[in-house]
Amino acid sequence: MLWDLSGGMVDQRFLVILCMVAFLAGCTQSPVTASVIVMEMTGAQPVLIWLLISSIIASIISHQFSPKPFYHFAAGCFLQQMQARQAEELRSKTEQEK
């Protein structure tokens, strides 16, 4: 679909790389890191500026939907689950001692 919008003027591989970096930057909200990782994975050093632009835009849009990056959100949920499990174990242990 995106390739059709370009009228076939843009190489499909370039669009795939831009979408890769946008997805990674949107999830991590780390545009520079996402750009460097995708650049190193694909060997796309000549298009680094386009990777940075795409990742910055994706990161800004992602921040509008969720102020926290995905990994911070996931870590918070994991921490809450572990604290609840630990509290339950402590509660059952004190009940057994009675």
UniProtKB/Swiss-Prot annotation:
Coarse class of the protein's main subcellular location: membrane
GO CC terms of this entry: plasma membrane
Compartments it resides in: Cell membrane
A GO molecular-function descriptor: chloride transmembrane transporter activity
Keywords: Cell membrane, Membrane, Transmembrane, Transmembrane helix
TM region(s), chain numbering: 14-34, 41-61
Top-rank taxon, per record: Bacteria
Membrane disposition: Multi-pass membrane protein
InterPro entries recorded: Cl-channel_core (IPR014743), ClC (IPR001807)
Protein name: Uncharacterized protein HI_0633
Species this protein is from: Haemophilus influenzae (strain ATCC 51907 / DSM 11121 / KW20 / Rd)
